[in-house]
Amino acid sequence: MNRPYNFSAGPAAIPAEVLQQAAAEMLDWHGSGMSVMEMSHRGKEFISIYEQAEADLRELLAVPPEFKILFMQGGGLAENAIVPLNLSRAGTVDFVLSGSWSQKSAKEARKYVADAHIAASGEDGKFTALPAPESWQLSRGASYVHICSNETIHGVEFQELPDLKALGCDAPLVVDFSSHVASRPVDWSRVGLAFGGAQKNLGPAGLTLVIVREDLLGHALPACPSAFDYKTVADNQSMYNTPPTWGIYIAGLTFQWIKRQTEGGLTGVAALEARNIAKADLFYQYVDQSSFYVNKVAANCRSRMNIPFFLRDESRNDAFLAGARERGLLQLKGHKSVGGMRASIYNAMPIAGVQALVEYMREFEQRNA
């Protein structure tokens, strides 16, 4: 089967090997006579799936032992409420606004905290650049500092996580890494909590990953629902309530796929990082030399995962999208809030897909310039 290239921002492409294995095991997982979707989450079959997935993820992301890995539900949007319900006892939380998702996080937190303080914002520049960390106005005694490390809509990415200690801040850093989790290594020495929906790089929608330092557990507000209390979830190995079993299974297969990846002598996440850099460089280099297309994001914070781009003559947008569909290049329309086009090139997107997109863009430019 010749599959098209899917540039969806999420739910996004899943590696074909993962889908094929899931299809083969759909009716009978490892001779159990059951589909994973039919298993009790407390049965030995699913417990083995869960434990393997957790161990593989800890290895892939080099998660230190003082961090708990939680498999939850609700997506990144729900975590915008769940995080302050768990961590905001001090009453003040700092937010760095770098795009739509960090804006949503601050707006949601205002329901639960006395002061959702905007420490810095890139809104004046239409979120085409990141506020320099040395310019952040961080609060004294804040419960935590929140960033979205990759903004899916605006295509802005922190190329490295900020070092709050170097900025004179003792608050833990909370990172929404939904759209680039497992695309590059994580410096856990700078992180207190990281969360993300699985539907971009790890599997299907419905599963949410939370990785939280143990000393941050046990501080939930009284109003926090027990199913969302990180300590309760951790104490029950993510099974206080029925977890998203199918999502955990597919994520586990994806973790195994990541472990098999190689690139220039590198393996796993390091291999994917090298591949992702090559994919992004290929695309940006073409757009930057073109007089027909434009990317508006500052070069030092361009996303490797989500690339918004615009035709200078927007009257040709519909023709561009129609031609792309004919070539098997799907879901390139930009988010409604910014317009234009967007190519999401997550881990599952092969470099051949980016090459095919660039070749189509070049041909379209030659026909219409």
Swiss-Prot record:
Annotated pathway: Amino-acid biosynthesis; L-serine biosynthesis; L-serine from 3-phospho-D-glycerate: step 2/3; Cofactor biosynthesis; pyridoxine 5'-phosphate biosynthesis; pyridoxine 5'-phosphate from D-erythrose 4-phosphate: step 3/5
CC cofactor: pyridoxal 5'-phosphate
GO CC, one annotated term: cytoplasm
GO molecular function, one term: pyridoxal phosphate binding
Major localization class: cytoplasm
GO biological process: L-serine biosynthetic process; pyridoxine biosynthetic process
InterPro entries for this protein: Aminotrans_V_dom (IPR000192), Aminotrans_V_PyrdxlP_BS (IPR020578), Pser_aminoTfrase (IPR022278), PyrdxlP-dep_Trfase (IPR015424), PyrdxlP-dep_Trfase_major (IPR015421), PyrdxlP-dep_Trfase_small (IPR015422)
Pfam families xref list: Aminotran_5
Cystine connections: none
Gene3D superfamilies reported for this sequence: Aspartate Aminotransferase, domain 1 (3.90.1150.10), Type I PLP-dependent aspartate aminotransferase-like (Major domain) (3.40.640.10)
Reaction equations catalysed: O-phospho-L-serine + 2-oxoglutarate = 3-phosphooxypyruvate + L-glutamate; 4-(phosphooxy)-L-threonine + 2-oxoglutarate = (R)-3-hydroxy-2-oxo-4-phosphooxybutanoate + L-glutamate
Cofactor notes: Binds 1 pyridoxal phosphate per subunit.
Binding positions (pyridoxal 5'-phosphate): W101, T152, D176, Q199, N241, T242
Residue ranges crossing the lipid bilayer per the database entry: none
Location of this chain's protein in the cell: Cytoplasm
EC numbers for this chain: 2.6.1.52
Keyword annotations: Amino-acid biosynthesis, Aminotransferase, Cytoplasm, Pyridoxal phosphate, Pyridoxine biosynthesis, Serine biosynthesis, Transferase
Binding site residues for L-glutamate: R42
Function, in words: Catalyzes the reversible conversion of 3-phosphohydroxypyruvate to phosphoserine and of 3-hydroxy-2-oxo-4-phosphonooxybutanoate to phosphohydroxythreonine.
Similarity remark: Belongs to the class-V pyridoxal-phosphate-dependent aminotransferase family. SerC subfamily.
Assembly with partners or alone: Homodimer.
Name the UniProt record assigns to this protein: Phosphoserine aminotransferase
Gene, per the UniProt record: serC
